[in-house]
Amino acid sequence: MGRLFGTDGIRGVANVDLTPTIAYDLGRAVGHLLEASGRRVVIGQDTRRSGDMLVAAVSAGLASVGADAIQLGVVTTPCLAHAAAGGEFAAGIMVSASHNPAEDNGLKVLSGGRKIDDEVEEKLERLLFQAESLPGVSNRELGRITRESAPIEAYRASLIAEAGDLLQGRRIAIDCANGSASAIAPDLLRELGATVTVLGGTPDGTNINLDSGSTQPAALAAAVVAGGLEMGMAFDGDADRLIAVDDRGSIVDGDGVMGICALARLAAGTLRNRILVTTVMSNGGLDHAISEAGGRVIRTPVGDRHVFEAMERADASLGGEQSGHVIFRDVANTGDGILTAIQLLKALRDTGATLAEGASQIRLLPQVVINSAVRHRDQWEVDPEFAVAVAEADARLGARGRILVRPSGTEPKIRIMVEGEDADEINQIARELSELARARLN
């Protein structure tokens, strides 16, 4: 059996790749890794139909080895992380496939409010592969399976305290992607004083991320313009990402959001060590804007876990990804779409700028990313024709741009990013490489 864990936990088509047996075995493995019966593990899920099945299975696995499973129901991943960071729980398990389609699902393990590191993940995977042989406990030592809501209320209270009166009187639109955000964001933002137009707020178990959310913000942009609203905020299925839309309908991605927040903090002297941490996918224009303001950018491999680890090493307070995962380490240990929206509003308030004005400070280079569906996503470097084509295209761009090719860690796709000064040239290169990838890697 190959590796189960990808860049963001275990993912696959529910009941096909990701079965109740795998979820049960993961529960047993997590319980054994805790090395103590009676430990409490908190579990959350997004709105997918398969979530109930997988939560039941992972809960049973935990209970079978003496760990208590505390189910929260439908919550955001940041809500689960907040609960897991509080010291009341030994670990957290989130049942979600984030931005993936409804037929997929996933399992993410958190400890101390953050995703587990590579070393813990490897230990967990070894235990998972031998889960059937792991000893159980006696009837008297079985764990309990219960439902609690107090951790959700504690998370809501933390957001309310962080926001203060920031949203009072604002007219905004949000897209909850028919996912976890629909359970908290509309009511919370209204409680904070905003007038809220809600898109993607009617989950039915099969429509999560369907033509909505942070990966498809076109409908949100149209709603903002049509309603004459101040801005829009798009979350993904488990609400750990934020993509913003300004009053003119222009998209402000994670690079723009990070840039606005970093520049505001640099101006105020509150960006710790004057460092912004982001990944190799982020636009080169972000580096230029931060450098001009007296800061510097540290790059990491793709994945918010890598970002957080680099933030710890550099003692940085702000980092994230172009996709909208943004980590404010002085407040939380993981990306949080709702918290990011609050921090973005703080940055705009502190600088007196609109979202469009804030985003205009960062001159992003033309960049195109194409996700090509391929069966053999890990073979791009060893396929001679494709590898040569990438090298030749990179040489063609020279110092005027860059090419990044990487397999998706969560889907059967290869991501091709081309960045440069000439939009027509980079689009042509990206199309050529994408067509070749589909021909050679399928």
Task: Go through each PLM region and give its residues.
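N-terminal small/polar loop signature for handling phosphorylated ligands or for N-terminal nucleophile
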Residues: 31-32, 40-104, 187-245
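Gly/Ser/Thr-enriched, mixed-charge loops and adjacent short helices
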Residues: 13, 105-227
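Short glycine-rich phosphate-binding loop at a beta-alpha junction
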Residues: 38-46, 70, 171-174, 274-280, ...
